[in-house]
C-alpha cells in the first residue's frame, strides 16, 4: 500500500536512520534540486510509473534498479526553484487546512462533551418505526439500498449509489427512513458508522444493520443534535461499549439505544449548539475540499513548467 510513497529528509529534522526496505536518493544539486525531485513524486506520470512497475505480489515493491530507469524532466535550476516555491505554497495551504480540521473537530468534541447525560433516548426519539419489503413492493423496479458499507466510518458520509432490483433485494433490506433521521450502525458502533439524513431520496431502503432514530418532535429535541452526540460524545460511546456483548461482532440493539442517556436541554440551547457545530463543520468541509484539490493543483504547476 505504501510502494512509491516518498518523503524528503531535511536537516532540520535532525539525525535519522531509514529502514532497510526504503531507498535513498541523493542528487547532484548543480542539476537537480532535491525538493524539485520530491515534487515530481506527486505527478501523474510518477504515479502511473509506480503502478506499472510495482510487483503483482502480496507485498508490491520496486527495487533500486527499477527506480534508476525512471526519467525525471530536468528544467533549468531557476525553473525548478519556481516549481518548488509554487508547490510549497499549496503544501502550506494543505497543512493549514489539516490543522484547521483537527482544531475544529477538537472544538466540536469540547462542546459536546461539556454536556451532561440525564434523559433516555426513548423519551424523545422513535426507533425503527417504518419497514418495507422491496421484493414485493418494487419487484421489477430498482431502488436505492443503503447497507453498512454505504456509510463512512467517523465522517458522517453516506452513499446512495447502490441500486438493486426489487426482486433481488437482500433479506436485510427492510428499514425506511424519513427526513431528519439519524442513522446508527448497530454492529461495531465504535467504528462510528453514523450519519444524519436531512432529506431522504425516493425509494431508499436501509439495512436492518442500522437503527433509524427520528425525533418525536423537532421542537422538543433536534435530531441533528442526537447525531452529533453519537459522533462526538465520549459518554455515549462508553454507554455503547458497555452494552456491547464480548463477541466476534459486538453490537447494540434497539432496547440498548432506547435506554442510552443523552443531555436534556432547552430547544434554544439545542439550536445554539447545532448552529455552532454546523459553522465548524462548514469550515471543515471547505478545508477538506482544499486538500482534495491539492494534487490536481500541484499537477497543474508541473504541466505549466515541464
Where are these regions (language model features)?
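A short beta-sheet element
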Residues: 1-42, 173-175, 179, 183-233
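Low-complexity, Lys/Gly-biased intrinsically disordered segments
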Residues: 3, 117-156, 164, 168-173, ...
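Short amphipathic beta-strand starts and helix->beta connectors
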Residues: 8-10, 53-56, 196-198, 242-246
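A structural connector/turn signal
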Residues: 12, 57, 165, 171-172, ...
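A short glycine-rich beta-alpha junction/loop motif
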Residues: 15-23, 55-78, 190, 204-211, ...
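Short, positively charged
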Residues: 39, 52, 228, 241-243
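Periplasmic-binding protein-like
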Residues: 46-50, 235-240
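Non-catalytic DNA-recognition/assembly elements of restriction-modification systems
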Residues: 69-136, 142, 259, 264-274, ...
Amino acid at each position: 500500500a505504501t510502494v512509491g510513497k516518498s518523503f524528503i529528509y531535511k536537516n532540520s529534522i535532525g539525525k535519522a536512520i531509514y529502514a532497510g526496505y526504503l531507498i535513498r536518493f541523493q542528487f547532484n544539486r548543480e542539476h537537480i534540486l532535491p525538493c524539485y525531485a520530491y515534487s515530481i513524486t506527486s505527478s501523474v506520470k510518477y504515479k502511473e510509473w509506480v503502478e506499472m512497475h510495482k510487483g503483482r505480489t502480496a507485498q508490491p515493491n520496486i527495487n533500486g534498479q527499477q527506480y534508476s530507469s525512471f526519467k525525471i524532466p530536468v528544467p533549468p535550476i531557476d525553473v525548478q526553484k519556481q516549481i518548488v516555491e509554487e508547490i510549497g505554497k499549496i503544501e502550506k495551504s494543505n497543512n493549514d487546512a489539516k490543522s484547521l480540521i483537527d482544531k475544529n473537530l477538537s472544538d466540536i468534541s469540547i462542546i459536546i462533551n461539556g454536556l451532561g447525560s440525564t434523559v433516555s433516548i426513548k423519551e424523545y426519539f422513535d426507533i425503527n418505526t417504518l419497514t418495507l419489503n422491496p421484493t414485493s413492493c418494487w419487484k421489477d423496479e430498482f431502488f436505492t439500498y443503503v447497507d453498512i458499507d454505504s456509510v463512512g466510518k467517523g465522517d458522517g458520509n453516506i452513499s446512495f449509489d447502490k441500486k438493486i432490483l426489487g426482486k433481488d433485494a437482500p433479506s436485510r433490506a427492510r428499514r425506511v427512513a424519513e427526513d431528519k433521521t439519524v442513522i446508527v450502525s448497530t454492529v461495531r458502533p465504535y467504528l462510528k458508522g453514523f450519519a444524519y439524513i436531512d432529506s431522504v431520496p425516493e425509494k431508499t431502503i436501509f439495512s436492518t444493520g442500522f437503527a433509524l432514530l427520528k425525533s418525536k418532535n423537532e421542537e422538543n429535541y433536534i435530531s441533528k443534535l442526537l447525531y452529533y452526540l453519537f459522533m462526538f460524545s465520549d459518554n455515549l460511546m462508553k454507554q455503547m461499549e458497555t452494552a456491547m456483548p464480548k463477541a466476534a461482532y459486538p453490537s447494540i440493539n434497539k432496547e440498548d439505544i432506547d435506554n442510552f442517556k443523552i443531555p436534556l436541554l432547552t430547544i434554544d440551547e439545542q439550536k445554539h449548539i447545532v448552529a455552532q457545530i454546523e459553522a465548524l463543520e462548514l469550515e471543515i468541509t471547505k478545508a477538506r475540499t482544499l486538500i482534495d484539490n491539492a494534487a490536481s493543483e500541484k499537477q497543474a504547476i508541473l504541466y505549466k513548467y515541464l
